[in-house]
Curated annotation (Swiss-Prot):
This is Ribosomal oxygenase 1. The gene is RIOX1. Binds 1 Fe(2+) ion per subunit. It comes from Homo sapiens (Human). Residues 1-35, 54-80 are annotated as: Disordered. One of its GO terms (cellular component) is nucleolus. Belongs to the ROX family. NO66 subfamily. GO terms for molecular function: 2-oxoglutarate-dependent dioxygenase activity; histone H3K36 demethylase activity; histone H3K36me/H3K36me2 demethylase activity; histone H3K4 demethylase activity; histone H3K4me/H3K4me2/H3K4me3 demethylase activity; iron ion binding; peptidyl-histidine dioxygenase activity; protein demethylase activity. Residues 12-23 have a biased composition (Basic residues). Its cofactor is Fe(2+). Widely expressed. Overexpressed in lung carcinomas. Residues 294-439 form the JmjC domain. Interacts with SP7/OSX; the interaction is direct. Interacts with MYC. Interacts with PHF19; leading to its recruitment to H3K36me3 sites.
Length: 641
């Protein structure tokens, strides 16, 4: 409590002559008054420029250059690709995605490919079965290949991961060259490289992930509610994300350890067995276990695979929560894991082969949106599945926390899929769990009613043995508790706890992926090097005329702690979860308003000379510190002295 309360101190910034009356129990920077005249002028300027920016034809999630053509809520309009309305059943026109029943399915029919894909079988639960709605996929649009977020070396299906497990910090691959293949993934990654805003890149990649379903429909009606199947009939959709060749290369070239990075498991006769030998997972051991019928689960593939890391690093900004992943390789005619439910929102991306999935609704209300993962269930514990389907490469399956699931390979075909996970312990309850103890402590310090003693005889009428008592003293006691609990909201340090959770998210996050533009205009692109016995191209400096903005939108958070202001950031994070300690910079009180302006104005540029500081020295000191740490980019490349 002391730490969070103390966090409010430095946020009431300014030198002693400008000290304001304390604002108890708020740790939020944004909740505090700014220097009104100067900061408001800057924000008005920023707002007007951002409005002008929206009218330009830059790629965005709503522009022709970057959006996915997807079905509108009203299927009475023309469908993407010129499909006639008559191709959709009347019922589907009334309810574009079918009845919101046990599961939701979407089938995309590519313009140039027709693959035989097993239909999903829906088993009625407590609600009517969902209808399969056929939605033509958007026509393929050719994207220029001169600027790739992930270039050929990182995206080729047969290429090694190439990144050590301890790699940290933002990275860009500039090896150049043309991939030997093309895929929807490659095209969307090339498109992301052309979008200037990291938030718009995250929205665009999520739109691609669940296409052709509109994201607003997904979040409004399905997120945390229903299982969703997207049937694409395009085996190349995820090509280049991860492959069995990538896994084999990792086993040969990386320090993959059993238990830490790789699990070998099988599910036989209703029992799961984990068969992890000690030590490194060399190819001989791993593939022998696979041949013996074990599924191989690669934990945290983003630590080894550049492409998976880039994929997750972009999406984590969409969720506002850590995005993780596992990769599962299952041999033919086998099942690796027992039925269970997880404590994460799961997106299953089928990469290779086929796999039969069965998904079940939570059995009881306490399992809905589960806070912890379940133990293994037996088949006798399960009812009828709400969704039973065979996933083909390119298909997507989503199910919320608490949905029981199991999967097996059949018909002599192996399966490789990646599960993208997010929203672990990111609930209202977790937020309140952090707030309430602090609110009680603050209330006891500031309100005498919380310090008054309990009735001397309260044990005579309170407790389980008196729960059926009609004693009026019991009624009065319960009413007093309700009144005090209602008052706690006035003392809840909501902003301070929000800042602490944001700080935790910064520490959980993967390091950012840089576009070509971000690299060229930041410290990562400076041409400083060692040549002929000395460093050359040294001396780039910011001036008051330099225009800057944050490198990306979600890479930093300003938090007050222990009477000081700290800017926590992600650019030095590791791809291995919490391998590095949290990284931060101290921000001086006279620079706090300027720091807030930079955080709030992204992606608009701000002149260094317009930063609301007391002196030019403070302006240049803040901007230079942020630039040198890789947190700022400039509108134009810096001139070298």
């Amino acid at each position: 409590m002391d730490g969070l309360q103390a966090s409010a101190g430095p946020l009431r910034r300014g030198r002693p002559k400008r000290r304001r009356k304390p604002q108890p129990h708020s740790g939020s920077v944004l909740a505090l008054p700014l220097r009104s005249r100067k900061i408001r002028k800057q924000l008005r300027s920023v707002v007007s420029r951002m409005a002008a920016l929206r009218t330009q034809t830059l790629p965005s999630e709503n522009s022709e250059e970057s959006r996915v053509e997807s079905t509108a809520d009203d299927l009475g309009d023309a469908l993407p690709g010129g499909a006639a309305v008559a191709a959709v059943p009347d019922a589907a026109r009334r309810e574009p995605y079918g009845h919101l029943g046990p599961a939701e399915l979407l089938e995309a029919s590519p313009a140039a490919r027709s693959l035989q894909t097993p239909s999903a079988r829906l088993v009625p639960a407590s609600a009517p079965p969902a209808r399969l709605v056929e939605v033509p996929a958007a026509p393929v649009r050719v994207v220029e290949t001169s600027a790739l977020l992930c270039t050929a070396q990182h995206l080729a299906a047969v290429q090694s991961s190439g990144a050590p497990a301890t790699a940290s910090g933002p990275q860009v691959d500039n090896t150049g060259g043309e991939p030997a293949w093309d895929s929807p993934l490659r095209r969307v990654l090339a498109e992301l490289n052309r979008i200037p805003s990291s938030r718009r890149r995250a929205a665009r990649l999520f739109e691609w992930l669940i296409a052709p379903m509109p994201p607003d429909h997904f979040y409004r009606r399905l997120w945390e509610r229903e299982a969703v199947l997207v049937r694409r009939q395009d085996h190349t959709y995820y090509q280049g994300l991860f492959s069995t060749a990538d896994l084999d290369s990792m086993l040969r070239n990386e320090e993959v350890q059993f238990g830490q990075h790789l699990d070998a498991a099988r599910y036989i006769n209703g029992r799961r067995e984990t068969l992890n030998p000690p030590g490194r997972a060399l190819p001989a051991a791993a593939w022998s276990l696979y041949q013996a019928g074990c599924s191989l689960r690669l934990l945290c593939p983003q630590a080894f695979s550049t492409t998976v890391w880039q994929f997750l690093a972009v999406l984590q900004e969409q969720f506002g929560s850590m995005a993780g992943s596992n990769v599962y390789l299952t041999p033919p005619n086998s099942q690796g894991f027992a039925p269970h439910y997880d404590d994460i929102e799961a997106f299953v991306l089928q990469l290779e082969g086929r796999k039969l999935w069965r998904v079940y609704r939570p059995r009881v209300p306490t399992e809905e949106l589960a806070l912890t993962s379940s133990p293994n269930f037996s088949q006798d514990d399960l009812g009828e599945p709400v969704l039973q389907t065979v996933l083909e490469p390119g298909d997507l399956l989503y199910f919320p926390r608490g949905f029981i699931h199991q999967a097996e390979c059949q018909d002599g075909v192996h399966s490789l899929h990646l599960t993208l996970s997010t929203y672990q312990r990111n609930t209202w309850g977790d937020f309140l769990e952090a707030i309430l103890p602090l609110a009680v402590q603050a209330a006891m310090e500031e309100n005498v009613e919380f310090r008054r003693g309990l009735p001397r005889d309260f044990m005579d009428y309170m407790g389980a043995q008196h729960s059926d008592s009609k004693d009026p003293r019991r009624t009065a006691f319960m009413e007093k508790v309700r009144v005090l609990v209602a008052r706690l909201g006035h003392f809840a340090p909501v902003d301070a706890v929000a800042d602490q959770r944001a700080k935790d998210f910064i520490h959980d996050s993967l390091p950012p992926v840089l576009t070509d533009r971000e690299r060229a205009l930041s410290v990562y692109g400076l041409p400083i090097r060692w040549e002929a016995g000395e460093p050359v191209n040294v001396g780039a400096q910011l001036t008051t005329e330099t225009e800057v903005h944050m490198l990306q939108d979600g890479i930093a958070r300003l938090v007050g702690e222990g009477g000081h202001l700290f800017l926590y950031y992600t650019v030095e994070n590791s791809r291995v979860y919490h391998l590095e300690e949290p990284k931060c910079l101290e921000i001086y009180p006279q620079q706090a308003d300027a720091m807030e302006l930079l955080l709030g104005s992204y992606p608009e540029f701000v002149r260094v000379g317009d930063l609301p500081c007391d002196s030019v020295e403070d302006q240049l000191s803040l901007a230079t510190t942020l630039y040198d740490k890789g947190l700022l980019l400039t509108k134009m490349p810096l001139a070298l002295n």
